[in-house]
Regions:
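Solvent-exposed loop/turn segments at secondary-structure junctions
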Residues: 88-92, 104-106, 117-122, 157-162, ...
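A non-catalytic alpha/beta surface segment that caps or lines the substrate-entry region
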Residues: 44-102
Length: 305
């Protein structure tokens, strides 16, 4: 804070002494970053990148590997340091897709946004292409800016069989300085326009839960959130097991979703996926990450008159 005040004072003095200079500082804010989140782009990921149509199968069907490869290509296209993290499950090798946006001044400090891209043997539009599309859209937006801390975006595999991908990542990075992890899991079912979300996490994650709730209030365009206590059934749990602050952001009506783990959990099901609601969930998460990783404003520029 002292540095920012000093820069402002020096800038003011320079402008006062040299009236031929005019400041054109952009004044980049977290709100500016959040405004770049696009429902059109989010929908394109959900409809066209992750194989969410009737008959698709991201469980053990052919669309599983195709979706993984598409996620890798997207991360790589955003300029992230992209890799596959292999792990074993039931005698076979699977991989998490990891994209790293390295921080400028505190690269050792890490914030993670994750979602599982696998499904049961169905299209898995809400569970959980909706969350994975959110990670893709957040990565697209945040990769365009600089932050003090490092942002890591992860598409986890084999969540449905017991959180195997997130367990593998958390255990491999147990000594990292992970300051916060958010799992996006089922963020697109919003019957009757209730516009509510649930936040799950243990008491040890109370701080990150509160900060995410605040971000939802600030950047969620009318979404409200409910602290729903503890739930260990998503990819935040392995991070909490290692004492990292972590939480789950999920649609409020998750327990009443009639298409959960059904063949018609698909973008083709009429009046099912609420793209606007899901996009606002993503905007909230982008705001949280930009705030906590500390957005670096664009430098001031000056024009000679």
């Amino acid at each position: 804070m002292r540095l920012r005040i000093t820069v402002t004072i020096i800038t003011a003095v320079i402008i006062g002494l040299l009236p031929g200079l005019t400041s054109t500082a952009t004044g980049l804010t977290v709100g500016d970053v959040v405004s770049q989140v696009s429902q059109t782009t989010y929908r394109d990921y959900l409809d066209n990148t992750l194989y969410t149509h009737l008959g698709d199968n991201r469980g053990f069907g052919p669309q599983h590997d195709l979706a993984r490869d598409n996620i890798y290509s997207q991360f790589n296209g955003f300029g992230l340091d992209t890799s596959l993290q292999p792990f074993s499950y039931s005698g076979s090798t699977y991989s998490n897709v990891v994209g790293v946006h390295t921080g400028t001044t505190r690269p050792q400090d890490v914030y993670i946004l994750g979602a599982h891209f696998d499904s049961v043997s169905n299209p898995g539009a809400d569970d959980n292409a909706s969350g994975t599309s959110g990670v893709l859209e957040a990565a697209r937006v945040l990769s365009q800016y600089s932050f003090e801390a490092t942002l890591i975006f992860i598409a986890f595999d084999r969540e449905e069989q017991g959180l195997f991908g997130s367990k593998a990542y958390a255990q491999a990075h147990s000594t990292d300085n992970i300051l916060g992890m958010i799992s996006l899991d089922m963020i697109a079912y919003n019957p009757n326009g209730s516009n509510q979300a649930r936040i799950y996490g243990r008491d040890t994650s109370a701080s990150i839960k509160g900060e995410l709730a605040e971000a939802i209030s600030l950047y969620g365009s009318g979404i409200s959130s409910v602290d729903s206590g503890t739930l260990n059934a998503s990819d935040h749990a392995p991070f909490e097991d290692l004492s990292f602050p972590a939480c789950l952001l999920i649609e409020y009506n998750v327990w009443n979703n009639p298409y959960y783990h059904k063949s018609n959990d698909s973008v083709d099901t009429p009046d099912y996926i609420d793209y606007a609601f899901a996009t606002n969930m993503v905007s909230s998460t982008v705001g949280f990450l930009a705030d906590n990783a500390v957005l670096i404003p664009e430098p001031a520029t000056f024009l000679l008159l």
